[in-house]
Amino acid sequence: MIKKIMKMAKIYKSKNAMIDAVPVIDRESKMFLQYPVNSNGCCNFTVIDKDKDFFSNIKSTKSNSKFLQEMFIDGTKRKPYLDIEHYYPSEKEFKKDFKRIIPQIVNDIIQVFAKEYDQVIKLSDVLLLNSSGQSSDGYKLSVHVVVSPKNKTFYYTNSKKIENNTAYHLYASLININSEYKDKENFNDKPHGYLDEQVYRKDATLRMIGSCKYPTGDRCLDPIDSKTLEKLDLTDKQKLNYLISYIDDTKPTILLETPIIQQTTISKTKIQHNEPTKTNINNKLLDLVKKYHPSAKQYGSSKEGYYNFNYDNRTEKCPLSGVTHDSNGFYVIEKSSGCFLKCYSKKCHGKSMHLGYVDETDQFVDEAHQINTKYLLQDPLVPKLLEDWINKGKTFAIKSAMGTGKTYLIKHILDKYKLNKVLWITHRQTLTKSLYGSFKDYGFVSYMDTQNCLYQYDKVLVQIDSLMRIKEFDMFENKQLVKKYDLVIIDEIEGCLSHYESPYLNKPDIDSRYIFNFMIDVIRFSNKLIVLDADISIRTQLFIEHIDKITNKGGNYIMINNSYQPITKTFTITNDEGDFDTKLFADIKAKKNICVVSMSAGAVNKIAVELNKMGTKYVSHTSKSNDSLKKNLEDVNNFWKQQQVVMFSPSIISGIDFNEIHFDKMYCIIKSGNKTCDPRSFLQMVGRIRHLGDQNIFCWYQQIPIFIDKTNKIIPKLQSDVYTFDDLLSYYRYYETLRNKKIIKNVVYETVEGDDVISFVNKSVEIDLFDKISLHNEVEQLNKHQDVFLTVLNRLIMRAGNKIDFKLVLKDDKKPIMDKINNREEEINIMIDLDDSKYDIKELSTKQTNNQLTEIEKLFIKKYYFKKKLGIKKEIDKDKLRELMTKYMDKEYFIERYEILFGYKKISDSNDDSKTKEKDRIKRKIIVDFVNILIGKHYNNCLNDSKLKRIIIKDDQYSKALKKIIKESMYFSNEEKYRPLFRKKKGSLKSNPKKEKEIQFYTSTLVRLLREYNIILKVESRKKTNGKSSYLRSLSVDKQIKDVVENKYNHQ
């Protein structure tokens, strides 16, 4: 058959080449086909005329050599269709369920047509193609459904989820009727569903009538009667009805209109409903794998970070080669285009199979316009799409690796389309400085260079923190005025959306939610929007779809996915500090040009000390660096190439594009935990350097999570459970029940549009985009935990097409090269010696706003606000101040926790956003509950510190209280939901409180949580009687913090 087609029509090696070869006006008259050519998933593509002689052209439908698949090109007509799949352990169970489920689904389809489309169809209008049969581990139900009446044709125009008039609507409607049809997220915990969601996407494909499974040639798709379920013998003319993309225009054709709000009901369920997550990436992968290896089990990960699998039933045929293997397992590698299965057998070397998607954004990206080019403007499709966007689109989104010409693309847009009013939103000062250096000749004004209201300027670069400066208040008409911009640009959109989690956005009169919703309204009334990034997550997807919805564009956003991958990098990660330092300084002494990317500012300072001794020319950028360095970032290429060593901390995550061929090698220092950046931001830091002489990046990660296997081999933990959106949403919905108050809410504005300005009036609803993005931000922050960080980092490295390797030791025996220095102690000594009378805080605040502070001035501001936080208004002894700074500097939150827990300050008086305030109230409630149980009191919201000076708890009293805490306390009765409040890793205590040795895990948790709130539970004494030990314990507040707080409030 395939040879016949090759004689009749041109064969294409890529889908896009085939599609582009057919003018849009001609596509409805063609049949688009693909067929596999080898076991690694490669296909050829062809186009033939869509006419009544289709089957006579391809001839016999019984040959096992046929593997044709229909392709439904986006924008062309296709009939309603479904793909039914299910697995059974035996043929008996298959036959029993087959007779039940198929008639049930057919009847539900008839119901959907009546209810959703107001169309009456009969049983005979629902056509069935059966490919069910024996699989390697039981029996598989496989039936394709096509709704194709003889006297008329129903059709949709696409198969994407987020679109009008889509075939996905039938699937969504059916699983709304019966949740049994939907695949469950965890393959192992619940029965598999029946309807396959994977067949609904851009340019979807399905096997056609008579087509067989590749490469075995078995289980051909045969027509069966929808009533008797018996096999049918059809003529070529009758078979045309079973072709999904064959639309007979001689019959009446009816478009099935499907509003977006209806079709997306199911796909958005995860965001709307209070259901905790039931899976993690490992379970999702196992779900995908079991479709091809039903007896598969996961066995950890390889050194390269791949996911290893094996299978029990050795009669299962390898899906790559069609042969059986006696012992070989297989593995899955995750890329940005999805998950691919590969086999360890030499017989399958070089072969792979695309399994599907794990990340929720993968399909969204896959449905974008696909290009593969080193520089965006080199692809002829890009200028064409720009024209389409200018003529009829709102949003232009680009996913493209760093260094692929996104900046030049924006210059091209500004040059060609002469857009007069442009707002460029940033999230980092370094990004703003770099962009200003590149675009100041276009007339842009940087918010960093003016203190005035930005409303008067037509082209503005502004950081989110200062976004409110673009509006002007009309005091005469009592209105706020905002320009209607021709274009809004958000470069590095992921970082921008993540920035809304910053606590610095929350002020007494405004918070991050308000700023975010203001940004959305500005974009809504602008003419055009561009968003760009090297990576796109669910946050950006939600953002793009929301803008599309509120501007009534209905799917008119244009997105480009540039799959071009620059040179592959290999990240070699070690926990051997001595080896890392040895290699680093050996390269510096060899006069190599080195870049050090560090997640720790302290590590940068430590290296700087050694470089000063060596007389090495270097520059380091941290948050504490002199602000004058930021000016040099406007011409970073010229500035950095003058240095032998360049070091930077997370103060430079985005915006810098160093394009010179200068650096020989890169070294990285990785740090996990709450006080540093997330894995995505770390890789953004690495990406600032576009060219490296050596693509092998050596990384030191002291906290790397490991375990020792039976052979004493050190194994990195790459598959820890991660927090998900569903986790956080379910926890917040639970928290809301505690106080009967909404935490996740919606604040929107009623808008009044004028010719050049917009005015806003507040209005409330129930849930909004900010909450969705905020929860995803919080997930990202929680997954910085030491046990989870590497799991996320490994995924991101693999998805980017890079490699990861490990060089681990049990103990670092090497003598340190660098002297031990205490950066914090040195910093405190400098602050102690500063003469406060020589500094004017108002003047320094102005310099801070203008980015003109020196390192010493930054330290004075830090000292000033530390003393203010502790209520120190008068001169204080230097030794006393040093003692306080040593204990509480950068830990001032302990003071505020004390103030709130003991009633000195209200939570409502803090500058946190409303969500954080509600979390603080719940945490306070948990601590109060612990104390009440321990001492037998009934405090409500606050404790009394005067009565917690030193309460003695006898052994019997403590034992009873501990048992009650484990069984009944607010925290331990639902620990899994409260862990994220205290930034603990996902999971719950598995210890058995009935076993004495395991009670210590509950005890340590109790002691630690109380200590975080300045309450000390400790053993005062131990007594042994008749060989049995008893303990006397005490509960008290931290006396030093108590004294600080009392002093602060006594002098107000």
Swiss-Prot record:
An individual GO BP term: DNA replication
UniProt record similarity statement: Belongs to the mimivirus R1 family.
Keyword Hydrolase assigned: yes
Pfam families (alphabetical): Herpes_ori_bp (PF02399), Herpes_UL52 (PF03121)
Positions bound to ATP: 400-407
GO molecular function: ATP binding; DNA replication origin binding; helicase activity; hydrolase activity
Protein name: Uncharacterized putative helicase R8
Class of this enzyme: hydrolase
Coiled coil stretches, renumbered: none
Gene3D superfamilies: P-loop containing nucleotide triphosphate hydrolases
Residue stretches making up the Helicase ATP-binding domain: 389-561
Species of the source: Acanthamoeba polyphaga mimivirus (APMV)
EC number annotated for this UniProt entry: 3.6.4.-
Keyword Lipoprotein attributed: no
Domain of life: Viruses
Keywords, sorted A to Z: ATP-binding, Helicase, Hydrolase, Nucleotide-binding
